[in-house]
C-alpha cells in the first residue's frame, strides 16, 4: 500500500509520526492531511531520506535546484552544490541537469545527501532523443515513460511532470500570445514535440499509465507548470489558468488512485496577483500542497533575483503557499555556483519564515520573540544562536569589532539598548 492508502484506512505510519514530531503536531493531523490530499511526505523504497512534510498546517518548505547544463558539465561541482544546499538548510533538492550522463550524475547527487531528490524526467527523454536522432521532436513515447521509470528506480522520489501541457492549453497559448514567451523548458520541449508530430502530450493522454509507474515506485507527482509566465506582464493569463484547471483535475485523479500530489504554480507574478494565484489554486485543487517557483515580483533585477524572490515568496507563503523553489543571484544570467546556491537557500528560508509568521503566528513568532529579548538584553551569544546563519552573524560583527563588547560598531558608545538598560528596566 502507498502512504495515501494507509492514511485513508486510518493507519498512522512511522513516517507520519516523524513528520508530526518535527512539526510539533499530532500524528493524527498528519494522517488526515495525507488522506485528504492536503499534505504529502516524499519517501522512497530505494533509499533512506530525511523526511519532510509539505502542505497545509506545516512550516513552509524550501527546495534548491541544481544540475549541469549543456555548456557546463562538472559532476563533482553538482555534488558539492547538493551538499552545500543541504548544509544551508534546504528541505528538498531537485536535480535538473540537461547535459552529461543523466543517471550517473543524478546517482552521485542522490548518494551524497539525505534530502528527498526531485527531477523532471522529460528533460532526459528529450535531450537523449536530440543526441540519438538529431532533434527533440523525434523522441518516442516509450522513451519518455522509460526515463520516468529509470529515474524513479534510482531513488528520485518526487517528479515535476508536465501533464497539463495539452492541445487545449497550447491552443490558448498560441491564440493569446505572450510578452515574455514560454520560459518553461519542459513546456517548450513538449509543445514543440506536439506541434511537430501533431499528437497529444502522452503524459496527458496516457495519464493513468503514468500514475501506475509513479505509484509502483512511491513517487510524489508534482504537476509541472509548463505554461507559467516568463514575465510579470503575462501572469495569470488564459494558458496558465487553463493548465492549472487540467492539472488540478488530474491531481485529484492521481490522489484517488493512491498517489501523493503537489500542484506547481507560476514563477513571475506581480505582488497584486499573488493572493489570487494562491487562492485559485487552493480552491480548485481541494487544498493540495502548492509549490511556487520563486515567485519573482519584478523582471528588472537580474543579479538580484534572489531578493526579488524573497519579496514574492514571503507574500506567497503568507497567503498559503506550502513549498517554495529558491532562486539564486545567477537566475536569468548563468548556471549558479556554490555561493549562489547557499545565498539562494538562505534568502528563501528567510522568506518562508516571514510568511509563516503570518500563516502560523503562534508557532513561528516565538523565534522572533526570543531574538527580540536577546537584543534587548545585549546577549550576543544568544543572538548568534538564534540567527538564521549563526556563523555569518558572528563573522560580520567580529570583522568590525567594537571597543565596547556589549555593543556593535553601528552605535558604539551610544547604543540605545545599553542606555535604556542602564537607566530603567523594560523587561517583559
From Swiss-Prot:
InterPro entries: ThiC, ThiC/Bza_core_dom, ThiC/BzaA/B. It catalyses: 5-amino-1-(5-phospho-beta-D-ribosyl)imidazole + S-adenosyl-L-methionine = 4-amino-2-methyl-5-(phosphooxymethyl)pyrimidine + CO + 5'-deoxyadenosine + formate + L-methionine + 3 H(+). Zn(2+) binds at residues 268, 332. Pathway: Cofactor biosynthesis; thiamine diphosphate biosynthesis. Signal peptide: none annotated. Its cofactor is [4Fe-4S] cluster. Catalyzes the synthesis of the hydroxymethylpyrimidine phosphate (HMP-P) moiety of thiamine from aminoimidazole ribotide (AIR) in a radical S-adenosyl-L-methionine (SAM)-dependent reaction. NCBIfam families: PRK13352.1 (NF009895), thiC (TIGR00190). This is Phosphomethylpyrimidine synthase 2.
Amino acid at each position: 500500500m502507498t502512504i495515501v492508502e494507509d492514511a485513508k484506512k486510518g493507519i498512522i505510519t512511522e513516517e507520519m509520526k516523524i513528520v508530526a514530531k518535527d512539526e510539533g503536531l499530532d500524528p493524527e493531523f498528519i494522517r488526515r492531511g495525507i488522506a485528504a490530499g492536503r499534505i504529502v511526505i516524499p519517501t522512497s523504497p530505494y533509499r533512506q531520506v530525511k523526511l519532510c512534510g509539505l502542505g497545509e498546517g506545516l512550516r513552509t518548505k524550501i527546495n534548491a535546484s541544481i544540475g549541469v547544463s549543456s555548456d557546463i558539465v562538472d559532476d563533482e561541482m553538482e555534488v558539492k552544490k547538493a551538499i552545500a544546499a543541504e548544509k544551508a538548510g534546504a528541505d528538498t533538492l531537485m536535480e535538473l541537469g540537461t547535459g552529461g550522463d543523466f543517471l550517473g550524475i543524478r546517482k552521485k547527487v542522490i548518494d551524497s545527501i539525505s534530502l528527498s531528490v526531485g527531477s523532471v524526467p522529460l528533460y532526459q527523454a528529450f535531450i537523449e532523443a536530440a543526441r540519438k536522432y538529431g532533434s527533440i521532436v523525434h523522441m518516442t513515447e516509450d522513451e519518455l515513460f522509460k526515463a520516468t521509470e529509470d529515474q524513479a528506480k534510482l531513488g528520485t522520489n518526487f517528479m515535476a511532470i508536465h501533464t497539463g501541457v495539452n492541445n487545449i492549453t497550447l491552443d490558448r497559448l498560441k491564440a493569446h500570445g505572450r510578452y515574455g514567451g514560454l520560459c518553461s523548458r519542459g513546456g517548450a520541449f513538449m509543445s514543440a514535440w506536439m506541434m511537430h508530430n501533431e499528437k497529444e502530450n502522452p503524459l496527458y493522454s496516457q495519464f493513468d499509465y503514468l500514475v501506475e509507474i509513479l505509484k509502483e515506485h512511491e513517487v510524489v507527482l508534482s504537476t509541472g507548470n509548463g505554461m507559467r509566465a516568463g514575465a510579470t506582464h503575462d501572469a495569470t493569463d488564459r494558458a496558465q489558468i487553463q493548465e492549472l484547471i487540467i492539472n488540478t483535475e488530474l491531481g485529484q485523479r492521481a490522489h484517488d488512485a493512491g498517489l501523493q500530489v503537489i500542484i506547481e504554480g507560476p514563477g513571475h507574478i506581480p505582488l497584486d496577483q499573488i493572493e489570487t494565484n494562491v487562492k485559485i489554486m487552493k480552491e480548485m485543487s481541494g487544498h493540495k500542497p502548492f509549490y511556487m517557483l520563486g515567485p519573482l515580483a519584478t523582471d528588472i533585477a537580474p543579479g538580484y533575483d534572489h531578493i526579488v524572490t524573497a519579496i514574492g515568496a514571503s507574500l506567497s507563503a503568507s497567503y498559503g503557499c506550502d513549498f517554495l523553489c529558491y532562486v539564486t543571484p545567477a537566475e536569468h544570467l548563468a548556471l549558479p555556483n556554490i555561493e549562489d546556491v547557499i545565498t539562494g537557500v538562505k534568502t528563501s528560508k528567510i522568506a518562508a519564515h516571514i510568511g509563516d509568521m503570518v500563516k502560523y503566528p503562534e508557532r513561528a513568532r516565538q523565534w522572533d520573540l526570543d531574538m527580540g529579548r536577546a537584543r534587548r538584553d545585549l546577549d550576543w551569544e544568544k543572538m548568534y544562536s538564534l540567527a538564521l546563519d549563526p556563523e555569518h552573524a558572528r563573522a560580520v560583527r567580529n570583522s568590525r569589532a567594537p571597543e565596547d563588547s556589549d555593543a556593535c560598531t553601528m552605535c558604539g558608545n551610544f547604543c540605545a539598548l545599553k542606555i535604556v538598560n542602564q537607566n530603567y528596566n523594560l523587561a517583559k
